[in-house]
Amino acid sequence: MSDAGGDVQVAPAAVAQGPMDKEGALRAVLRAAHHADGLAKGLHETCKALDKREAHFCVLAENCDEPQYVKLVETLCAEHQIPLIKVADKKIIGEYCGLCKYDKEGKARKVVGCSSAVVTNWGNEEQGRAILTDYFASKN
């Protein structure tokens, strides 16, 4: 085999598209945690992870159907000093956690709502992790 050929340029895996905000960091971290099998979705899994103190942080929907669910998750987070992020809609959490189908254009379709989620393994998203840890530090 000869080396007759031009140089092959490889595109970087993730191109930085400017500074990442809290929402973008949350989306990236939840997707990375989903791929690394470090995401607990739903009330039952969330409460188990919070009780075992395995959670790095928790995400809770503000439009949760049951006020007792909200109270339970907030209390567990406060008791175990686990950071809590509130999101406006449970469909947003469902989309970020991968509970949806994507069409040809890459838009989320048939999104299933998710009231709460917990990250137990960060995955390989370093930029989002740094932004969220800075956010948690500034919040306290």
UniProtKB/Swiss-Prot annotation:
Protein keywords: Nucleus, Ribonucleoprotein, Ribosomal protein
GO terms classed as biological process: maintenance of translational fidelity; ribosomal small subunit biogenesis
Source organism, top-level taxon: Eukaryota
InterPro entries registered for this protein in UniProt: Ribosomal_eL30-like_sf, Ribosomal_eL8/eL30/eS12/Gad45, Ribosomal_eS12, Ribosomal_eS12_CS
Gene Ontology MF term list: structural constituent of ribosome
The keyword Transcription appears for this protein: no
Pfam families: Ribosomal_L7Ae (PF01248)
Subcellular compartments: Nucleus, Nucleolus
GO CC annotation terms, alphabetical: cytosolic small ribosomal subunit; nucleolus; small-subunit processome
Protein's job: Part of the small subunit (SSU) processome, first precursor of the small eukaryotic ribosomal subunit. During the assembly of the SSU processome in the nucleolus, many ribosome biogenesis factors, an RNA chaperone and ribosomal proteins associate with the nascent pre-rRNA and work in concert to generate RNA folding, modifications, rearrangements and cleavage as well as targeted degradation of pre-ribosomal RNA by the RNA exosome. Subunit of the 40S ribosomal complex. Involved in cold-warm shock-induced translocation of the RNA exosome components from the nucleolus to nucleoplasm.
Family recorded in the similarity comment: Belongs to the eukaryotic ribosomal protein eS12 family.
Assembly, per entry: Part of the small subunit (SSU) processome, composed of more than 70 proteins and the RNA chaperone small nucleolar RNA (snoRNA) U3. Subunit of the 40S ribosomal complex.
Name of this chain's protein: Small ribosomal subunit protein eS12
Natural source organism: Caenorhabditis elegans
Name of the encoding gene: rps-12
